[in-house]
């Protein structure tokens, strides 16, 4: 007789292989400061029981130039690829740029006793999202199985196969354009103030195109890069720090505001305008609002 091993015949493995190469450069020439960075990466995730591993590759860079500790410019980029997308749409290029001006290093503000630090800054860039969830390889057509139907003289149940979600050979990266404008300031060397305004336009969001593909076509509709969402708002923070004898203290607070709106969602045509999700916030709940109960037949007859 042998011993029963509850784990016999059962195994699970997950291997994550990540490779990264990095090159940095930083040098100052008098009043000129130059720095740069280049990076390449490759990620592979293999899970037991899955025939196809997950692959992501990319490279990126950052280049910065500063003049006399007053003017700053920076350019960054990413060139990334994901196996989630078909050949020809697998890679995306995502650049960004920013500028800054430290006004208190100018001669007319250098020794100001009230405004001891002021930096104005702005940035604009494009980012991409490959973590889309759902089905992998939505650009490839596949078949599902399920259900049975009687076949033959014996009416034996035969398993059925049917066409799965329609392939989308044009699926690609979701993208976001980001604009940020703000400043950092210090008053009397004690009060720090930071302000940021942001405007983010998301495009090519994966959504089901109910408007362009009606239900009567007879197949399960694929997700397509049709959605558009806008997010904008501001953030204001302040921090006051001081010292009384040997006692250090600070007071900090902030105000935030953000608003998002669905600009386009390819939703089906509705009978009434209030039924559309477009123009409202993301994931906003919808429902009918009751105005009361009927009291009697006369109340029913008088209702609109």
Regions found by a protein language model. Give the residues of each.
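Extracellular/periplasmic, surface-exposed regions of secreted and cell-surface proteins
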Residues: 1-287
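Intrinsically disordered, low-complexity terminal/linker regions enriched in Pro/Ser/Gly
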Residues: 288-292
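Extended, highly charged linker/hinge segments and catalytic-adjacent loops that couple domains
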Residues: 294-298
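Short, intrinsically disordered, charge-balanced linker/junction segments flanking boundaries
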Residues: 299-304
């Amino acid at each position: 007789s042998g011993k029963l091993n509850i784990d016999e015949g059962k195994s699970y493995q997950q291997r994550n292989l990540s490779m990264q190469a990095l090159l940095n450069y930083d040098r100052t020439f008098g009043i000129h400061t130059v720095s740069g960075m280049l990076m390449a990466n490759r990620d592979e995730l293999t899970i037991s029981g899955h025939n196809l591993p997950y692959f992501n590759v990319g490279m990126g860079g950052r280049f910065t130039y500063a003049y006399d500790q007053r003017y700053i410019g920076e350019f960054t980029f990413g060139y990334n690829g994901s196996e989630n997308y078909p050949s020809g749409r697998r890679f995306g290029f995502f650049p960004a740029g920013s500028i800054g001006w430290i006004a208190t290093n100018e001669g007319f503000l250098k020794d100001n006793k009230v405004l001891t630090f002021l930096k104005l800054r702005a940035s604009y860039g494009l980012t991409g999202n490959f973590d889309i969830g759902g089905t992998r390889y939505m650009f490839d057509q596949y078949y599902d199985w399920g259900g049975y139907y009687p076949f033959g003289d014996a009416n034996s149940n035969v398993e059925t196969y049917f066409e799965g979600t329609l392939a989308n050979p044009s699926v690609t990266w979701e993208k976001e354009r980001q604009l940020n404008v703000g400043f950092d300031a210090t008053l009397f060397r004690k009060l720090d103030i930071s302000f940021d305004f942001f405007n983010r336009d998301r495009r090519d969001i994966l959504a089901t195109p109910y408007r362009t593909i009606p239900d009567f076509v007879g197949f399960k509709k694929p997700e397509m890069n049709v959605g558009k969402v806008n997010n904008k708002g501001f953030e204001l923070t302040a921090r006051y720090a001081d010292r009384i004898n040997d006692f250090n203290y600070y007071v900090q607070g902030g105000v935030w505001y953000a608003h998002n709106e669905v600009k386009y969602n390819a939703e089906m045509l509705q009978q009434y305008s209030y039924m559309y999700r477009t123009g409202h916030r993301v994931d906003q709940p919808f429902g009918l609002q009751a105005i009361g109960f009927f009291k009697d037949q006369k109340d029913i007859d008088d209702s609109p």
